[in-house]
């Protein structure tokens, strides 16, 4: 591949898996994130574990800061002078009853998941105008399925998917392809609490996957490598599910996790029996 790539949120989880797969494809990868210690540890692990002609650099970056994102793009493109691949992976989650959700919670999720992705796509596209490139945003099946107790997160990912489609339509003339990947549940740092303490929710996810298993970060990375390469050169504006078939069925039931955090009285004020997928 021998291309330059930027992966936001590349220090852990799906972002780490994406960086590893891009390095395996001989890309010159820069991972970005807010915590330098996390990035340094990730870079050391990648350098030690990935055997290829790829390379790894780090840059501290808060994706909600447009100037910081432009600086990160410049770092990623520095050695070659151009950026070939940008992966807008940085994101946060939030869950809880709609009636108790605050506008601050919604705003904070949108700020990272939508504005942060916008900053990344725009900065990368500005660099790619002369030579083209591939931009991939990491969305979620939540953007397609919605679901109870996920109003902030699901709406942010739905907005991200439409941002991708709109950007793809405008940027195609520059030879820039823009797509998103909608992962299903992936075992990573971000989902560790569910795997360790809420196996019933993971089981519910599996029941709604035709393939019957959860994903690995590297499987999302494989999809990124395909979207970044010549094999997908006629693909743009697409929201691609990498989810074991989950979007063929329904959203997971998060009620047990939410109910565990509330008293019966609190819960009765926020949700009514029979309103869930199994009700």
Describe each model-derived feature in a short phrase.
Residues 11-13:
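Conserved glycine-rich cofactor-binding loop
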